[in-house]
Structure formats: C-alpha cells, structure tokens
Amino acid sequence: MIRLVGKRGKGSFESQLDEAAKGKEFVQIDCTSDNTDKVMREGLSPFYIGPVECYDGLQSQTFESAWQCAKLYPNSVIDDCVDANRHPAPGYFAWRDKFWAKRYPEDFPNKSEIRFPAGRGNANKCIGAWWKVNGTFERLDYIPSRKAIYIPVYAKAVVKTEAYRRLVELRDSGKNLLLIDFDGYNIHHPKYNFTYRDAIHCWRLRMGHGFVLAMLLEGLIRVENGEVKYADGLMEETNREYSPDLRKLTEEEKLIRGAHEGGVTLEEWTALSLDDRRLLKKAAKTENAHARGFTKAAWMRLPVAEKFAILCGER
C-alpha cells in the first residue's frame, strides 16, 4: 500500500490516513530536504536532484530550478523578462541560465532563494511557464505546466537515483510506504476522495513531487527508454467539481479559479476588468452557452476575443 501525506498544517500523519490504511504498519519516507538520510534526501528532494534534462540539450543542475525558472514574470519583477507578446525576452534567458547553472546547497545561501528565485513576494505574479512541448515552445498555464514540466521532468530524474531504487525494493518486499511531502495529501481520505487524475487537474491544491513518486510506485507512471508513459486516462482533463471547503484559496488560486471558470488563460483573466470577468463567468454557465447555440465545452474553447465579440453584439 502506498499513501502520501502532508507536512504543512495538515495534522498528524495518523489523522491523515483513510480507513483502509489505519492500523497498518508503514515505513515512513520523508521525501523532502528535511530527510536526515543523505541518500534519500539528495535522491528525492527537488532541491538536490539533478542535473535534469530540459529541452534543446539544456540542463538544470537541480529539478527545483528547472521548474521555478521555467516560469515567466512581468518586467516589473524580472527586468526585460518578456516582450509585448508575453514571450521570453533576453532578461528571462539570463535569469534562467543563472539559476539553471547553480547546485544546491553550495550555490544558494538559503532554501528561500532556490524555492523563490524571483523573490518570495513575487511567487503569485507568475504569468505562465515557458517550455518546449512536442517540438514547439509554448507559454503554459498552471495545470498544463504541471503536466508538461513538473511531472515528466521529475519522473525521468528520480528513477535514476539510488533513493528511488530503495523505494522500489521496499514496495516489492511487501512493505507499506508512507510518503511525506510538504505539498502532499492523502487522496484516499474522505476529505478529498480523489483519484490521482483528480489531483493532477485540481487547480485548488498544490501537487508536490510526492505525488509523482506515488504514481511511479503505483505503476500509473513509468519511464521507458527515457520517455514517460502514463496509465490510460491519467492525463485527460476532468470536469470534477472540487469541494469548496478543501482550504482557503490564496490570491493566486482565486485568479486561477476565475480563469478556469471563465474559459480563458490566466494572463487574459488577470488583464480583464471586474465587470468583464463577471460577464465571462456568467456566459460560461452551461445554460447560457446552450442559449447561444454552443455546448459548454465549445464555448470554453473559443478565443477570448471571439467570446467578447459575441457578448458585445448582445448588448
């Protein structure tokens, strides 16, 4: 049995277990940089694991920097980061390359710098992530970047480590594994009652590397000849409605939720006035889409300019 629990404000590990897991004996595995076992710490923590392959032959010395420095920010945060189209400008590449070349801990004065390379106070100002997907560079929103960057890059790196080999040996010997991560939670707990597919596509909750480890150990993800393979349906979008009481939303998550409900990108949503946001959210309701001759899915796929052209024609 594999279970994942969180370290950050989620109560005791025992309280996070579901009924099927309670009473079982688990081997506890701290997947973070707090692990006192050097092999496990440096083989599982995103701060240490690396070098990792990115794109076009480029490497980042740590997975954490690969992920954090794929993100784009306004020029007010990183000088000359993006051009008028919100694509990377020279300042972005200089910033990215600087951090991709650093090793942890020797090149970082503290954990905060590797975790927040644009500054702790700027984390919620990210306007997307820049990555090469199927041969084409794209600026990715929250969930697409999770699927195109976070999951596959970590999976390909971690399976090469001695730490992961130890986890596989424990699993294959019949041990129950309790993975512990800052951004983890037990999908089987009644509070969530998720599948891993739900967790991947849930914009309301963070998805830490512990989830990738759990999916690898459960056989939902595998790495074959350097390529990541997924169980059928795992990466397909879900229309599941998530319980509003999971936890209080951050300001960043409120924006992400609004963009999701309005059927636009996070960047487009951020640029809209409050009145236009309300208009888009109302128009995206199933009954209103049908009234305009669209299915909800078809309406959501329309470019934002086309949506407003239709809506403005009704005014």
Regions found by a protein language model. Give the residues of each.
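Charged, low-complexity intrinsically disordered segments
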Residues: M1-E314
